[in-house]
A protein has these predicted regions:
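Helix-rich effector regions associated with P-loop NTPase G domains
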Residues: 2-3, 56-59, 63-84, 90-128
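Hydrophobic anchor at the beta1->P-loop junction of P-loop NTPases
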Residues: 35-37
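The conserved Walker
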Residues: 41
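Conserved lysine of the Walker
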Residues: 45
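N-terminal pre-Walker A segment at the start of P-loop NTPase domains
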Residues: 2-24
Length: 128
């Protein structure tokens, strides 16, 4: 697993750009990748993930599914052929124990992880 070894920053202000960048990402990501998305409420983090997952589904000739924010469930899972994708929304998570209870970090090497509101993770890493 690579953590922060190749950080990139994208400033997306238009939905069409979000769609285009998600198409490029869908060609580059693979198992073991962790993508953290930052931004205020309503800036398009979930929209980016929706486009990304739907691009991966099309690329792998699988049916496109509805991609919704996991704000209340904390995580949504998508299986595309043999690729497991975890979509996390950590907005409501108060402490790292909540993540441990759902098995967060257990399968990072075997999946693609898309994380909205990853700031809690940074706090935990800084405190170690």
């Amino acid at each position: 697993m690579h953590i922060g070894t190749n950080p990139k920053k994208f400033n997306i202000t238009e939905e069409e750009n979000t769609k285009l960048i998600s198409e490029k990402f869908s060609e580059l990501i693979s198992k073991g990748d962790v993508i953290c998305l930052h931004g205020n409420l309503g800036v398009g983090k979930t929209t980016f993930i929706k486009y990304l997952i739907n691009n991966l589904q099309r690329k792998n000739n699988t049916e496109e599914t509805e991609v919704a924010s996991p704000t209340f469930s904390i995580v949504n899972e998508y299986l595309i052929n043999d690729n497991l994708i975890y979509h996390y929304d950590l907005y409501r998570v108060k402490n790292i124990d909540e993540l441990n209870n759902i098995g967060f970090l257990e399968d990072f090497n075997k999946s693609i992880s898309l994380i909205e509101w990853p700031e809690l993770l940074y706090k935990k890493i800084d405190n170690q």
